[in-house]
Regions:
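Conserved phosphate-binding elements of NTP-dependent enzyme cores
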Residues: 1-941
Length: 941
């Protein structure tokens, strides 16, 4: 069958859809936000494809995979196994990096293990293999009379029971072994947990160093090397043991390293991970700036968290410490600001006096007392308290004053020094993964390997080159493999998974993607489209939910869903090529494609007001000492290719520095020399795409504050007054009015052993969240549950005569959210929808005209018609005297800006510079600006 046939799709707002989608083609599903695109692509096609695949597996396998609900659809024919690549960011696990997520790091570990050259971490000398004579000579250098054990490590950090190993070595005549550090008799019944990792070392011999033991020692070392894969451990009684390898050792200092294995290069394995930070690269430590936020205060008032309670004036224990230390070093502290105290003295206060003892003097009701002891230091004391506390609350409290600080042992490299001393060419594995992806590929291609190394590495190099190229093809050449996966944007993480899927080479699969072009500059769009076509050409069906016009024109077929959002959507308006859609009179998308409808370029752009916010000398991440002005009272767009430093400049430097100053916060901020012009604004609001709440209880009504007003209305009804119901009766968060069977959730979770957990409507309240008595109170014939079930559009009409409520809900409708329900769980809202709920909440507030609004890619998830509405709203905010600053790639929005700040020229280390600033027309004339080159077509210059 060469097509997927869907009959009677009714999931969410889909109106009994019947549609045929060609297989093994690139198909774009487009339409307004909330029109039903995701309902068709993800909740119908993907859900059913995944469900059928999982149902075919055993019940044992199903419990790990989880099964999806059967979508509301009569039938789907011709379905393939489905893989979804959505906007959800990759793992927040600090151990996940771009390298591990893409599996490129696995190939690099293999490369370093097979053709890496080890160097001594102490001397920097190339390490060669050790002969038996060299090993014996080194052992014989021990002092006469030293007791030693010779051991052969046969199992190192591997899971299993190993009963056969114990039996074999006992048969060979060995008597004892050391298992996980404990000496055991091989004749004993040794029980090991097969799920845990173990180390087993066979005890070969026990010796005392004398002149005449050389022959016996040589024989024992030979035996150990034979049974333990060229390794031998010499355990010196009363001292440290030493590992020798017949493979590699430093001729100068005697440092030896075992045979290189891929596990040694993994920071997730004890064999390679830095023991100090366990391979994470950083440690959570007390931050001096957070503990001493106010350097203008005195020592008594300025240090938080120290002493018997939170530090405050008159805290006698802390005062005694400080005064005694000050007396010891001859420093005056009374009435002196912290910033004026000697730094050497503050070092002693913060980090301790080491072995130096202080005469502590303190007074009590029984007289004056002396105690001589070193001072531990504020930071070591608080870190010890943090380690020792058993209270989750206290731990959380201490962590408010802690930050992630680079590990002092590995300096963020995550690996042991001996592993970092292994090089391929001139670089170790950390230095290589710190390079941008494009540079890594160039470096690997330029390597000069010997004939033998070439034979060993050729296949590994092919795989590496192929996978690196896939990442370059999807516009991610600026990323480094060492970048933490949790710091990637939704678009970046989706494109990484897309590149990984191409690398897997699967065929006959249905891929469903959610706006892969998000966060991608127009310059890189063609590479992404080529990648999607490559995935299709492998023999897969590629279905993309997308608003990008270039992708539509590149697709084999476009499906336009609409005509409106929510209840007004769910129909197929047009289906065919982009050229055919452009001719359709039913399709809003077609009207924009053909130019019959468009977002107009402003006839006149706002003039500069003479008021600016200025960042001076920003150097965070890849920013190259950037100094830039942002004109206030304007609509500003910050543009540039992916990875050029836009988010770093705006979110890390500008927003965090302003927020810290205006709110006296202890927030860690992006590095810059200074920030000027703050007196021109009274507040800064960052309207991002994070969820409006983390639990199903949070919803648009609670977030916007309209739910409080609605509960006030219900509390003033005659029925509520007669029953004595207060406002709290109409809350589903507290006992009283809520249904106690489901605690006001409206749903009950049922745990299934071999299936995913099932959520069913509460049988008592039928999903309405409230008890029967509360639901009897009606306003205009509707209960509180009925109101929460209304769409925004319905609620605007319902509360037409209550301006306070109507105005708040009206702003939700204005930002294109007329289709969402007032009580819709926040967990079901997309990032773009959550951002617009926040935007609507801000719009409904009284404007001061001195606010800076920051939005990071507000067009995410928006159809061009929704972008049209968004532009109108943002312009309204600026008309009231405010400043709107957006980070954006969408040229339809960029062309309406008053002022553009363009970063570049490239991404990553080649970015971080200001390429051009000014009105859009000026940017188009800048030859180095990629944004300007593409903007010309939109401004018809």
């Amino acid at each position: 069958m060469d097509k997927i046939i869907i009959k009677g799709a009714k999931e969410h707002n889909l109106k009994n859809l019947n549609i045929e989608i060609p297989k093994n083609k690139l198909v774009v599903i487009t339409g307004l936000s909330g029109s039903g695109k995701s309902s068709l692509a993800f909740d119908t096609l993907y859900a059913e494809g995944q469900r059928r695949y999982v149902e075919s597996l055993s019940s044992y396998a199903r419990q790990f995979l989880g099964i999806m609900d059967k979508p509301k659809v009569e039938s789907i024919e011709g379905l393939s196994p489905a893989i979804s690549i959505d906007q959800k960011t990759t793992s927040k696990n600090p151990r996940s990096t771009v390298g591990t997520v893409t599996e490129i790091y696995d190939y690099l570990r293999l490369l370093y293990a097979r053709v890496g050259t080890p160097y001594c971490p102490n001397c920097g000398i190339k390490i060669e293999k050790q002969s038996i004579d060299q090993i014996v000579d080194d052992i014989m250098k021990l002092e006469q009379g030293t007791k030693i054990q010779i051991l052969g490590p046969v199992v190192r950090e591997k899971k299993g029971e190993y009963k056969k190993i114990f039996e074999e070595y006992q048969k060979e005549g060995y008597v004892r072994a050391r298992v996980d550090g404990e000496t055991v008799e091989l004749s004993d019944d040794i029980e090991l947990d097969r799920k845990k990792k173990h180390t087993i070392e066979i005890i070969i011999d026990r010796l005392v160093i004398k002149e005449d033991i050389r022959a016996r020692l040589t024989e024992s070392v030979e035996t150990a090397l034979r049974i333990a894969n060229n390794l031998v451990i010499v355990d010196v009684v009363g001292s440290e043991e030493k590992l020798y390898s017949a493979n590699y050792a430093c001729p100068k200092c005697g440092f030896s390293i075992e045979e290189l294995t891929p596990r040694m290069f993994s920071f997730n394995n004890p064999m390679g991970a830095c023991p100090e930070c366990t391979g994470i690269g950083y440690l959570q430590k007390m931050d001096e700036d957070l503990l001493v936020p106010d350097k203008e205060a005195t020592l008594y008032d300025g240090i938080k968290l120290y002493g018997s309670s939170t530090m405050k004036k008159g805290d006698t224990i802390a005062q005694m410490y400080f005064e005694s230390i000050a007396k010891h070093y001859g420093v005056k502290i009374k009435g002196v600001k912290i910033k004026d105290l000697p730094r050497s003295f503050m070092e002693k206060i913060m980090y301790g006096t080491g072995d130096e003892e202080i005469d502590f003097v303190y007074k009590s009701s029984t007289g004056t007392h002396h105690n001589t002891a070193p001072f531990e230091g504020i930071i070591p004391t608080l870190e010890r308290r943090h380690r020792d506390t058993k209270s989750a609350g206290m731990m959380q409290w201490y962590e408010m004053y802690m930050t992630e600080q680079e590990c002092s042992a590995c300096h963020g490299a995550r690996l042991k020094p001996e592993v970092l001393a292994v090089k391929v060419g001139t670089l170790n594995i950390k230095e290589l993964t710190d390079m941008p992806i494009r540079s890594i590929k160039e470096y690997l291609l330029s390597l000069e390997l010997s004939e033998k190394e070439e034979m060993i590495a050729s296949q590994i190099m092919q795989e590496l080159s192929k996978r690196l190229q896939f990442l370059i093809d999807v516009g991610l050449d600026y990323l480094t493999l060492s970048r933490s996966a949790g710091t990637l944007s939704g678009g970046e993480s989706q494109r990484i998974r897309l590149a990984t899927q191409i690398g897997s080479g699967l065929t006959g699969v249905m891929y469903i993607l959610d706006e892969p072009s998000i966060g991608l500059h127009q310059r890189d769009n063609n590479r992404l489209i080529t990648t999607l076509k490559k995935l299709r050409d492998l023999g897969n069906s590629v279905i993309v939910v997308e608003h990008d016009t270039d992708t539509m024109y590149a697709a084999d077929q476009v499906i336009d869903i609409g005509p409106g959002a929510g209840v007004h959507g769910g129909y197929v308006l047009a289906q065919g090529t982009a050229e055919e859609i452009a001719k359709s009179d039913n399709s809003i998308t077609g009207k924009y494609l053909s130019g019959r409808m468009q977002i107009a370029v402003p006839k006149k752009r706002r003039n500069l007001t003479g008021k600016y916010l200025e960042i001076v000398g920003a150097t965070e991440h890849n920013l190259k000492n950037v100094t830039v002005k942002f004109p206030l009272g304007n609509f500003i767009c910050v543009t540039g290719v992916s990875g050029s430093g836009k988010s770093t400049l705006i979110n890390d430097v500008l927003y965090k520095n302003i927020y810290k100053e205006l709110n006296n916060s202890t927030m860690k901020v992006g590095k810059c020399k200074s920030l000027k012009g703050l007196h021109h604004i009274d507040k800064v609001i960052n309207i991002d795409q994070s969820p409006i709440g983390r639990t199903p209880r949070s919803n648009p009504a609670t977030y916007t504050g309209v739910f409080d007003l609605i509960r006030d209305i219900f509390a003033t009804t005659n029925e509520a007054k007669m029953r004595g119901y207060q406002k709290g009766r109409f809350s589903f968060n507290v006992p009283g009015g809520r249904c106690e069977a489901c605690n006001g959730d409206g749903i009950i979770k049922i745990e299934m052993n071999f299936l995913s957990d099932v959520y069913v409507p509460c049988e008592v309240c039928k999903g309405k969240r409230y008890n029967h008595e509360t639901l009897e109170v009606k306003y205009k014939g509707k209960s509180i549950a009925d109101v929460l079930d209304m769409t925004v559009e319905e609620a605007v009409t319902f509360f037409e005569n209550v301006p306070r409520i109507k105005n708040k809900i009206q702003t939700l409708k204005e930002v294109g959210l007329g289709y969402i329900k007032l009580g819709q769980s926040s967990t079901t809202l997309s990032g773009g929808e959550a951002q617009r709920v926040k935007l609507a909440t801000e719009l409904s507030k009284t404007q001061t005209g001195k606010t800076l609004y920051i939005l990071d890619e507000p067009t995410t998830g928006l159809h061009i018609d929704d972008v049209h509405r968004l532009v109108d709203i943002l312009q309204k905010l600026v008309d009231k005297g405010n400043t709107v600053l957006t980070i954006e790639h969408n040229l339809d929005l960029i062309k309406t800006a008053d002022y553009i700040v363009d970063l570049g020229p490239e991404g990553g280390v080649k970015g971080g510079q200001i390429i051009a600033t000014g009105k859009p027309e000026k940017i188009c004339k800048e030859p180095l600006s990629y944004t300007g080159q593409y903007l010309k077509d939109y401004l018809e210059i």
